[in-house]
C-alpha cells in the first residue's frame, strides 16, 4: 500500500528543515526527502565551519552547529525523514501528486520544493596544473579548519564566500592571502571592513595564470596582474582555496512530468510561495520574486508562508493559528 502524506518537502537544507518543523507544528503528516546522505544541504556539505551571521537572535553560529540545532528541533514531531533518496519524478493525479524516488513511490496532497540551487558543483580553476593539484594542494571548500593549521594559504575569489573563508582561516593558518581580479570586492560592506581590519593580505588585481607542485609538496602559484601585459608574480602556498562560486543544475525539476516556470534556473513563485503548478510550492535559494534576497534567514521566513498556504487551501479545518506560541507540539 502506498504511503500517503499531507505535505512532502523535497530538499533537506535549512529552509526545507524549517518547513518540516513548521508543518509539524500544524500536525500535518509530513515527509522530508533529501538526496544527500544527511540533512543540511549546502551548508552542511560545503560550509560546516563557516560562521553564519544573518540568523536572527544568534550573534554567530557555524554551519555545523546550525544544522545540528535544526535536527534537534525536528525531533519534536513524528516526521518521516528520508535521506539518500533522490526524487526522480513527480506526477499530478486526482488527489494530489505521486512522488517517485529511487527507493519507491509515495502519495502527497501538496509539495514544497526546497532544493536550493539544485545539484551544485564548484566553478573550477581552469589553468595549467589545476586539475592535477585538485584535492591535494588545491581545494574548493573548507570542511575542517584543522586541515589548515599553521599553513600558508591563498584564497582566490572576490565574493562573500571568499571573504568568509579568508577570515575563517586567519586564526588557524600561518598566513592567509586573499586574491581577487578586481580592486574592489563584491562582499557585504561589513565583511569587507572586517577583511581590511584583519591580518589577511589582500592582493589585487591579479589572476591565477598557472599552478605547479614544488619539490617540498607545496604549490607554486603564478599570477598575472590584470591590465598589464607583462607584470607577473609568484607565491608558494601550502593550500590554495578557490572560491569562484558554484554552478547549479535543476536536473531534478527537468525530469519531472510537470513543468515549473523558471527564470535563470530559479523557480517563479507567488506571494504565497506557490509555483506555476497548483499544489506545488517552493522556498529557499532556488526561488525568485521581486525583492528576493538569497539568505538563510529569508528561507526561514518563506517556510511558514508555504506551509500556512497549504493548510489554508487543502486542510482548512485544521489550518490552526499562525503563531508558534499558540501551537503545541505533539507529545
Curated annotation (Swiss-Prot):
Pfam families: Pyr_redox_2. HAMAP family: FENR2 (MF_01685). FAD binds at residues 34, 42, 47, 87, 120, 285, 325. SUPFAM superfamilies: FAD/NAD(P)-binding domain. Its cofactor is FAD. Disulfide bonds: none annotated. The keyword NADP applies. Binds 1 FAD per subunit. This is Ferredoxin--NADP reductase. It is an enzyme of class 1 (oxidoreductase). Homodimer. Keywords: FAD, Flavoprotein, NADP, Oxidoreductase. It comes from the Bacteria. InterPro entries: FAD/NAD-bd_sf (IPR036188), FAD/NAD-binding_dom (IPR023753), Fd--NADP_Rdtase_type_2 (IPR022890), Ferredoxin-NADP_redctase_2 (IPR050097).
Amino acid at each position: 500500500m502506498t504511503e500517503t502524506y499531507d505535505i512532502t518537502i523535497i530538499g533537506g537544507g535549512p529552509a526545507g528543515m524549517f518547513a518540516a518543523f513548521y508543518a509539524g507544528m500544524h500536525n500535518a503528516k509530513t515527509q522530508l526527502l533529501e538526496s544527500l546522505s544527511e540533512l543540511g544541504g549546502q551548508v552542511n556539505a560545503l560550509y560546516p565551519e563557516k560562521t553564519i551571521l544573518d540568523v536572527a537572535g544568534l550573534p554567530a553560529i557555524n554551519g555545523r552547529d546550525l544544522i545540528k540545532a535544526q535536527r534537534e528541533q525536528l525531533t519534536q514531531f513524528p516526521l518521516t525523514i528520508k535521506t539518500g533518496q533522490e526524487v526522480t519524478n513527480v506526477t499530478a493525479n486526482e488527489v494530489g501528486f505521486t512522488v517517485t524516488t529511487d527507493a519507491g513511490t509515495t502519495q502527497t496532497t501538496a509539495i514544497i520544493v526546497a532544493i536550493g540551487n539544485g545539484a551544485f558543483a564548484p566553478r573550477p580553476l581552469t589553468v595549467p596544473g589545476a586539475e592535477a593539484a585538485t584535492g591535494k594542494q588545491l581545494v574548493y571548500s573548507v570542511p575542517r579548519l584543522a586541515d589548515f593549521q599553521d599553513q600558508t594559504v591563498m584564497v582566490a575569489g572576490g565574493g562573500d564566500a571568499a571573504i568568509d573563508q579568508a577570515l575563517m582561516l586567519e586564526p588557524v593558518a600561518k598566513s592567509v592571502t586573499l586574491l581577487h581580479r578586481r580592486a574592489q570586492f563584491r562582499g557585504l560592506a561589513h565583511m569587507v571592513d572586517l577583511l581590511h581590519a584583519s591580518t589577511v593580505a589582500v592582493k589585487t588585481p591579479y589572476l591565477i595564470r598557472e599552478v605547479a607542485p614544488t619539490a617540498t609538496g607545496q604549490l607554486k602559484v603564478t599570477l598575472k596582474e590584470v591590465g598589464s601585459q607583462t607584470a607577473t608574480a609568484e607565491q608558494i602556498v601550502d593550500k590554495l582555496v578557490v572560491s569562484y562560486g558554484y554552478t547549479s543544475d535543476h536536473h531534478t525539476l527537468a525530469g519531472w512530468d510537470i513543468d515549473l516556470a523558471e527564470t535563470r534556473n530559479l523557480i517563479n513563485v507567488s506571494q504565497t510561495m506557490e509555483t506555476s503548478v497548483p499544489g506545488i510550492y517552493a522556498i529557499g535559494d532556488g526561488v525568485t520574486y521581486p525583492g528576493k534576497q538569497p539568505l538563510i534567514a529569508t528561507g526561514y521566513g518563506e517556510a511558514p508562508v508555504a506551509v500556512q498556504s497549504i493548510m489554508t487551501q487543502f486542510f482548512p479545518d485544521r489550518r490552526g493559528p499562525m503563531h508558534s506560541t499558540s501551537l503545541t507540539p505533539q507529545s
